[in-house]
């Protein structure tokens, strides 16, 4: 097996699982803040580990898919981008944006069904991830099992691609600048964690409105067009609704970015 592929596979799995387990309670609080009816109506501080099962099951394969795609596409796209533009910095930014976007789309094949199950369990639609999955498989709304599991797919993609287009070029830029400043070839795991935290926090705050839309679509009883939902939310709850949960989301992803990318760098350095 190719060493780069194996390094990305194992590093991604370790990073994804550790981050989701540590920060799951904050994600639960964020989801309940964004859900219709508000925080306490959807469970408040009770059962903040509800839905953890689906998150853990999806963490390793989802993160592995992302990094395998991201790292392999970086190697393939960098020479291509270098031929398209004379600016080395622009070529690097475009490479990281495209590679991370393709990585996110791959990861969402696993992540979206897990998110649907997790968020419905977090907001007390059911008592466990397994019970939520069984309910979706019974297809009570008649929309179809696959449609039910992948509800909010495009909204998730529309949230994740802007997020990753901000996070990973910024993350790679900060790492490069830090390495140049310290006169080292590659940043250490803790330095990568700091860069990941800064990049993740900025990207999280900027994409909160898309995250709110994604959460509402996944929790809605039936499929609803995204623009229709956005207009309804604005009319009924005002513009502030699109920034609900920005604090927990930014805090969670900023701290999560430190662990996610710190663990990734630490494990990757072993190969």
UniProtKB/Swiss-Prot annotation:
Entries under SUPFAM superfamilies matching the protein: Mitochondrial carrier (SSF103506)
Subcellular location: Mitochondrion inner membrane
Keywords: Membrane, Mitochondrion, Mitochondrion inner membrane, Repeat, Transmembrane, Transmembrane helix, Transport
Membrane topology: Multi-pass membrane protein
Family per similarity comment: Belongs to the mitochondrial carrier (TC 2.A.29) family.
Gene Ontology CC entries for this record: mitochondrial inner membrane
Taxonomy, superkingdom: Eukaryota
Residue spans crossing the bilayer: 6-26, 51-71, 97-117, 152-168, 193-213, 251-271
GO molecular function term, any single one: S-adenosyl-L-methionine transmembrane transporter activity
Solcar repeat extents: 3-76, 91-177, 187-270
Identification of the protein by name: Putative mitochondrial carrier protein PET8
Major location category of this protein: mitochondrion
